[in-house]
Amino acid sequence: MNVPSEWMDGCNARTIDRAKAAYETAGRHYHTWDHVVACVERLKTFPSAQPRIVFLALVFHDAIYVPGRTDNEQASATLARDTLSAMCDITATELDAIERMILATRDHHALSGTLSADEAVILDLDLSVLGGSRDEYVRYAKAIHDEYVPAAATEAQFRIGRTEFLRRMLALPNVFLTAEGRRRWDDPARANIAWEITELTARQGFLERWISAIRRAMAGAVL
């Protein structure tokens, strides 16, 4: 990963290797090191008051990830604090800011009215894949599916939960929190989300009709 040298000021060269190793756990399809690299590449051209702090938060924001768990962000924030305090010349204020950024990724819009400018930046970068090309989005959607099914949900559970999440996103006044994020990604994100909802509901409808037909056939056999 090539980043501006000032983003690594005061940090041991092995800091990134330590973070990268955490992303090598089994079962990851989307929340991988490639996701981090993609976010960091977008940060290079994204307005930010403290890009070094946003960068360090991005590096650790999905370091701990188990599908279905609700404490991934807290565990990732703890790992970030422990690693950075040991391997970087970094202040307590900066560590607190990094922790808040990582914890904010737990629910991207729940705290939207209380976020700092750079907390909004990291959230937009984290979701920027939503506004990618259709091919990029299709790969993302498949990767999310493969992380959850069957590790944390059945196919039907995933489709229902995913559709609900996407509908909530589409109902928001803005998918992205910053003016720059909205300018770059809001319109394509809405088109991609609407496409995925159509795909999910069509397949869910087919599955429900198929199950209903099987049940009717079984009932006829019993009678």
Where do the protein language model's features map onto the residues?
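His-Asp-centered metal-binding catalytic motifs of divalent-metal-dependent phosphohydrolases/nucleases
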Residues: 39, 51-67, 76, 98-106
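Divalent metal-dependent phosphate-bond-processing catalytic cores, especially two-metal-ion Mg2+/Mn2+ enzymes
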Residues: 2-3, 24-31, 41-50, 60, ...
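Histidine- and acidic-residue-rich, metal-dependent catalytic cores
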Residues: 22, 76-111, 167
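Alpha-helix N-cap and coil->helix boundary residues
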Residues: 14, 49-50, 71, 75, ...
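Hydrophobic, proline/glycine-rich low-complexity stretches
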Residues: 1-17
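Amphipathic alpha-helical interaction segments
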Residues: 46, 65-70, 87, 109
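Active-site metal-coordination segments of metallo-dependent hydrolases
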Residues: 25-38, 65-78
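Short, well-structured alpha-helical segments
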Residues: 13-20, 33, 37, 55, ...
